[in-house]
UniProtKB/Swiss-Prot annotation:
Bilayer disposition of the protein: Multi-pass membrane protein
Topological domains annotated Cytoplasmic: 107-109, 217-223, 295-300, 406-412, 484-491, 590-963
Underlying gene: CHO2
Name used for this protein in its record: Phosphatidylethanolamine N-methyltransferase
The organism's place on the tree of life at top rank: Eukaryota
Example of a GO biological process term: phosphatidylcholine biosynthetic process
GO molecular function per UniProt: phosphatidylethanolamine N-methyltransferase activity
PROSITE patterns: SAM_CHO2 (PS51598)
Subcellular compartments: Endoplasmic reticulum membrane
Amino acid sequence: MSSSAADPSAARLNSDVRQRHPTASAASEDVEDALLQQQKEADAAASRAKKTYGKTPDGTVFVVPTTHDMVTQLLDPREPKNLSDVAVLAIIALHFLAAYYLPWGVKRPLFAAIFMFWRLAYNVGIGYLLTIQSKYKLLVTWAKRWKLFENPATGKNPRPWLYNLLKKELETKIPQDYKFEEAPIEYNTWLTFRRVVDLILMCDFISYCLFAIVCAHKPDGEGFFVGFARWVVGITLVGFNLWVKLDAHRVVKDYAWYWGDFFYLIEQELTFDGVFELAPHPMYSIGYAGYYGISMMAASYDVLFISIIAHAAQFAFLVVVENPHIEKTYNPPQPRVRSESEAGSQLQEVASEYSVPSTSGRHNDNSPQPVHNLIGLKNLDFFRITDVAVVLLSAYLAVVTMVTPNTRFYQALFVLHALAWRVWYSFGLGVILTMQSEEKMFTRHFLKYGESLGEAWRQWKGIYHLSNCLCHASFIAACYKMYEFPAGGDNGWALLKHVVGLGLIALQVWTATSIYESLGEFGWFYGDFFFDSKRQLTYTSIYRFLNNPERVFGTAGLWGAALITWSRAIFLMALAGHFLTLAFLAYVEKPHMQKVYGRNLRDDAGVTKFIKRSLPPPVTEWQQSIDKVLDETKHFIDEFVEAARSRLATGSSTIVKDTSALFNKYPARLTISKISADLAGYDPKHYGLSLAGTPVVGTNEKATGKESPNARVLKDVKTQSFEYGAPIRVKWTAPAKHSKKDWIGLYMVTDNRSREVTEVPSLGRWVPTNPGEYDTTTDQGILVWDQPVEKKSEDTDLVEGEMIFEGDKLWWTQGVFEFRYHHGGGHHVMSISEPFEIQIPKFDDEHRGVDISAGSGEVGERAVEAALLPVIRNCLDRDPDIAPSNADERFGGHVERDGKYARRVVYAIRHMFGIDFAPAVVLADGNVRRLAWRICHAKEVLAPFSMSHTNGRTTPVDSKFSE
């Protein structure tokens, strides 16, 4: 027996101790469990924070799993491989085998063709797929229609083997956070699309490199240092290209690399740093520097030219495919402002431009802004003196250049002529702008003679535009005179100089275009020198990367021309032009910008910030010391110029004082004579169409008094007439067994000769009778379908439906139209509606009791507003986000994005009021009230030339002739 058993008290003590030990241990375990639980929750929260969430168009939110780039997936042995990887690698291997075994004479043209095939597959093939996905979600629609991702367990998938293959392929690549069955169909479609992209991109790059290898050679007579420099520059460009691609992929990940935003959006802020601060669209611009590096290493003009073609095709892909989608997705139109608190202070600045005498005497504070721009061929107007002067002087210069001989005298004369225009353009106009900035000299000159600020602004724009055009025209003429066709022994270098020179010229043209798109007409002509600008500085387009793009890129064309001509005189001209441009920026533009915008000016642009962050500390310190020396030098020059400013101002003041639809029909008519085999059993008498719309003209207005008495009698049959742009409802009737692919199209009555077969395409003006049968967004017009009709005959069961034609499905012109019911996706006509008319009623001021041409003031404007508002609402599709509900509300942002709305409005105004406006007028005015003011103002100006009784007569019959 133990001692504890013999001693009861000891036994109780031991028992208590044993009981207390488990209690303490349990408490400790609870604390540990709590800590572990907290750690797990923290880890889960951190994991959730690291995860990316996607959102489909229908609002489904899902976790976007981590994926890897195509090179890693294909070539990294640590990554799992699947059947599609094997297929891609096999096709790549075929390229290498062809490059190795084919005869030498066949390799070059064959690989050029292979590369162009893959490049077309990239830019045209992928571009087409992305376009239809962006506009219609067509890739996702195809996946739904083919039931690619429908679980076979439901019994609805006709191809279970394909489902299992896709499941295995995709889940092998994404082992975490991804289940094939649970992922949204948009994400699965994107993953499938990625595999096609991987094949095309890899083959595109491999075929290009093999073509370069096939074409590579050492030029005859090339020295060691030239060859060494060629390889160093080429390797540097390829390395730079590789860094651009890797850094771009680091920023945008696979989501943007594979155009994921065409399928779904990610719920996080998009940040663009690194290479995206260096250049616009770096993957398509500087991201192709490696092409030119490989061309240098290959020393082949064939590789260079095919690189230029491929690069140009990539820019076309960017403009046609990506930019429209980016605008639609990330830069949608701003919500329409439904009230205007600002009365139009900016309008008052230019109201004086409309200084036509008014008989009404009304106040024109809300007069609209002018929209007659100068820049661009589309704005060329031979009724404007500036444009006429530019064209005539340029033509004179071209004729003189062509007819004069290329002697040294004329060459020197043309160079001096170009230099004089360059000095006037930079120095002369710079002095005028400086005096305008400091003293408003240019404006004061016109005010002195009773002119307005608007007149001064117009005259300045004309002077600047004429000087700009003739400065460049005279430089081109000088280059023409100095150009000599390269000799036979210099063809190699001459070709390179021409290619690089043309590239520099294209760079300057692109820079000027980007500057104009960013600044607009106001900024291009230095409008803030003339008006008190209330605009905020926005660094968009090229200004996102550079503060002054003119400093380097703005004169690139001068150096390009110098390379092409290879003339010392043109090199000196380019140097002088570059120096004058830098001086203009430093002494004219920069001081004014600092005075007007002050601290709102940023110090460093995107490129500068990136370079400063990339420099090591010693280089940064050296750069700061150099900046200090340059600042001190600049201050010295500023003091020197300030001392001579009064003399320059006096001299320049003396100089200043003393000196416009494609065919509606398809080009080839298509007559379908073969009737569908399944047409048997369908009787056209069982089909019917009826219309409902907004009527516009009564039958009593059809009789004008010019007809015979019999023709004035009202007929039983009344032709329907609907408002221009108003939606039209179509009710159809068909047999219950009608084809689900039937469709109804809208046509002009005169477009089709046959009543049995439609001969012309519908051009998008059609709606199917049943949803889900076609791949585009035509289903949007369907309202009701396949509703049983009360049986009126015992032989056929009928159904009916209703659809609406609006927006782009309408004809935006006047005329007589009809609807046609077509069978089974073909063009065989089963029924034709009664013809109806689309008409724009003319504004009849005589019957309205106002005479807007005679200055009836606000009464006339209100009458015009009342007549114009419903028409404009129709033109803007009656969309509450675009169309105004009253005369003061501004038009929606879509009007500025899509020119079709403005063209509809000006067409309606031309037929309502007889006034022909440019579409830009609609954008400038922005609401019905200003448009009404402009219409009244135009009618007032044209009143003496009107043929109507109220607006005037062509012959002054009220006054007697002198005897």
